[in-house]
């Protein structure tokens, strides 16, 4: 791809744990025309030592957007939360394979049978080929470029090779999943991430919300920064 094509084809998914929840409706309505997905992190305080958003949040988000709601479950028992997310209106539900080793096929099937899309999230140390037994079922594979649990961590560049491996696997075997990167996507990393060929960029505090108090302005600034960084390749 030429750089301008990368820039035009880039899909951005704002991480809503980083938004200003005191301005919930205002910020969502400002992003509705631009966001490809809304990334909703649900943590249980056990799998990761943090507690963030919830199915109740999804239910309220669903009332004010048609943008696909993409849920990332960082929980030890995804089977308990998946039905709640489906009922709340989630479009895509992803979990960490380590939390579901004896029931991965059951959970992926449950999500698909509810008419939703399914995915898995790979931690920085989880290899790409670990998904090969069920890759044909996946709609999305998210690569964590930081260890999961907290916003604002340092980018782990070794994870970019995993994106390339996932894209190569997709091309070789005819899989249909999107690739997505989660963690520290911002002005410092856009160039190297875009070069990996990833489909979706999850943007949070440093990549989007801290750029301007007005989120519509912040979005414009993010797109300008992204275009500049990827054009300099």
Give the predicted meaning of each segment.
Residues 10-15, 38-40, 69-73, 93-95, ...:
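Hydrophobic faces of well-ordered beta-strands that scaffold small-molecule active sites
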Residues 23, 91-178:
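Conserved anion-binding
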Residues 24, 31, 41, 85, ...:
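Conserved, mostly hydrophobic/aromatic
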Residues 27-28, 79-87, 126-137, 184-201:
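Catalytic cores of alpha/beta
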Residues 33-34, 64, 88, 114, ...:
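Structural motif
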Residues 38-54, 146-154, 209:
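Glycine-rich, proline-tolerant flexible connector loops at the mouths of alpha/beta enzymes
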Residues 40-110:
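N-terminal active-site wall of soluble small-molecule enzyme domains
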Residues 208-233:
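C-terminal helical cap(s) of enzyme catalytic domains, especially alpha/beta-barrels
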């Amino acid at each position: 791809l030429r750089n301008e094509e990368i820039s035009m084809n880039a899909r951005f998914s704002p991480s809503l744990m980083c938004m200003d929840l005191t301005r919930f409706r205002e910020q969502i309505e400002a992003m509705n025309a631009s966001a490809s997905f809304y990334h909703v992190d649900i943590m249980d305080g056990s799998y990761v030592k943090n507690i963030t958003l919830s199915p109740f949040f999804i239910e309220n988000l669903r009332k004010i957007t048609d943008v696909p709601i993409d849920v990332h479950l960082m929980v030890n028992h995804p089977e308990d939360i998946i039905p709640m997310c489906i009922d709340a209106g989630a479009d895509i539900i992803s979990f960490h394979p380590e939390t579901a080793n004896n029931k991965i096929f059951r959970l992926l099937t449950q999500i698909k049978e509810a008419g939703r899309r399914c995915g898995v999230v790979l931690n920085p140390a989880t290899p790409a080929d670990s998904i090969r037994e069920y890759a044909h079922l996946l709609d999305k594979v998210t690569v964590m470029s930081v260890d999961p649990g907290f916003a604002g961590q340092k980018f782990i560049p070794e994870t970019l090779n995993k994106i390339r491996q996932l894209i190569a696997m997709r091309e070789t075997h005819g899989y249909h999943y999107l690739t997505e990167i989660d963690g520290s996507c911002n002005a410092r990393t856009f160039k190297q991430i875009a070069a990996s060929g990833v489909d979706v960029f999850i943007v949070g505090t440093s990549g989007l919300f801290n750029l301007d108090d007005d989120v519509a302005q912040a979005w414009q600034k993010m797109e300008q920064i992204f275009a500049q960084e990827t054009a300099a390749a």
